[in-house]
Amino acid sequence: MLPPFFDVLSKYSRRGNLQFSCPGHQGGQYFMKHPAGRAMYEYFGENIFKSDICNADVDLGDLLIHEGPAMSAQTYAAKVYNADKTYFVMNGTSTSNSVVINAIVSPGDLVLFDRNNHKSIYNSALVSSAGKPIYLETARNPFGFIGGIDAHCFNEEYLRSEAAKIDSEKAKEKRPFRLAVIQLGTYDGTIYNARQVVNKVGHLCDYILFDSAWVGYEQFIPMMRECSPLLLDLKPEDPGILVTQSIHKQQAGFSQTSQIHKKDSHLKGQKRYVDHKRFNNAYMLYASTSPFYPLFAALDVNARMQDGEAGRKLWADCIKVGVEARKDILERCELLKPFIPPVVDGKL
């Protein structure tokens, strides 16, 4: 029933090992020496303190080089999410985006840049990594919602002409763009068809990063299948796919739990391929050597919850609740109206 890392962590914490290195609270004992600390201990419960253990303990594997139960957890998550590799990140998707872009983009590389991108992508792609942006214009719909990228921005001739303004030589290359960064789902809920994005611009890019901070559930809902970059059938001429997800936003995770999915095995042997060693060097640049194991365990458990038919039923139930809530609002409310089409399947 339990996934690999959480299973080992829960058994380990029950053993009650003494820790002579760190954390200094020693399984919560230090907190118990003061009324404020005792109140905190009793509020959170003993297991959260017993699960906060030193990263030097070999029983749970190394989270930085990905071995043991830690590696098993990420391998399991990759299987659940249809990725080639998955990396658990414990300081948010701002960090996940920084890891990806640091691994992919070098100074002077051209980056196709969605104007809806999160600030972390601006900071990592354009400042830290010194990429050169070709901005993809975005729009708002009549309701003021943050919409998608304007259609003309997916035209190859237009993109090459914009790239030529920045770097005339790269604009002529078969793949002028090292990376495209697309917000798969905007803050207001506009979601792309990932297949269409890849069909339109994939042949121009080495990699596409889909920032999925506000989504991540699309591949578990049949009607949203085409929105999932991780369900694409990729060939050697396709771009590598990278997906970052804020598990704490729409799935089961503590705040700051995030993950990176890497789907690029179809690029192996090509010059543009980024291997695990290079990618993990970027990962370690942003990872702490003192990880909080309950965060890692939450990512592990989240993958278990999404797995198989049980996970799909959770999302089917969620969709049903959303539909019924809209019906109730339409029937009972005068001042509130959900944003739905006036006609669905020919019915008003």
Region locations from a protein language model:
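Hard-cation-handling environments
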Residues: 324-348
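Short N-terminal helix-initiation segments at or just after the protein's N-terminus
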Residues: 29-32, 46-51, 55-58, 190-191, ...
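Charged, glycine/proline-rich intrinsically disordered loops and linkers
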Residues: 34-51, 221-239, 339-348
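Short acidic/polar alpha-helix capping motifs at helix-coil junctions
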Residues: 36-42, 85-88, 162
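N-terminal glycine-rich, Lys/His-bearing helix-loop that initiates the first secondary-structure elements
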Residues: 1-50
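Short active-site oxyanion
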Residues: 84-86, 108-111
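Conserved N-terminal alpha-helix of the aminotransferase class I/II PLP-enzyme fold
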Residues: 46-95
